[in-house]
Amino acid sequence: MKFTVARDVLAEAVSWTARALPVRPASPILAGVRIKAEGDELTLSSFDYEVSANSQIPATVDEAGEVLVSGRLLADISKSLPSKPVSVELDGQKVTLVCGSSHFTLAVMPLDEYPLLPAQPTGIGAIDSSTLSQAVSQVSIAASRDDTLPLLTGVRIEINGPAITLLATDRYRLAMRELDWEPADTSIEEVALVKARILQDVAKSMTSGAKVEVGLSGESQPGASSLIGFTAQGRRTTSTLMDGDYPAVRRLF
């Protein structure tokens, strides 16, 4: 594997992909970021069995290939590089990064032990990125931070045709925001419960594009899904949904 990529493009993509890596991963392999060089682009991926992130960026690929390296170390190195093209090459069990006079070496992690990322859920509609960001910011502040009540750490998403409702409560506060979106099917009805911190991260990191595509998959029964996905500007992320019966707070409005 051998490629050249712009420093700023690489640093931003690595930072975004590695942002959700666990500080204390259940397995050391989950601290890695997978880099795939193919065609005229790089694909960077991370996964911790709950949240996956995937970012595609343009690059000059001389030799196609795939490798797994420490995500946080790669992020730190990328940010410290000068503003010049970065040359990356796989040499046996190490990856070398050369940028101007800077030279770094990263140990390779066992790629065959890395879990497969979940497939991106089928898109069910799109929403303006700034509208989503504002709504999540307004509602998520009411979500609980007490992990002893896990359901209340989530934001309930109710989809009813062309309308989406976000709800959150910590038993003392209650927030709701209704907003319009562009559903693929105007008769769609879905409910999803997403951890507030994950939804906040998505809303903050996907504001550069005009639209964010939303997807749901893994339906176990009508109106119920197990995975939610968001796609925007070459970035894709998925999250498992929370299980359980959310308090019936809708009737209070």
Residue ranges of model-derived segments:
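Structural preference for solvent-exposed beta-strand-turn elements
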Residues: 1-253
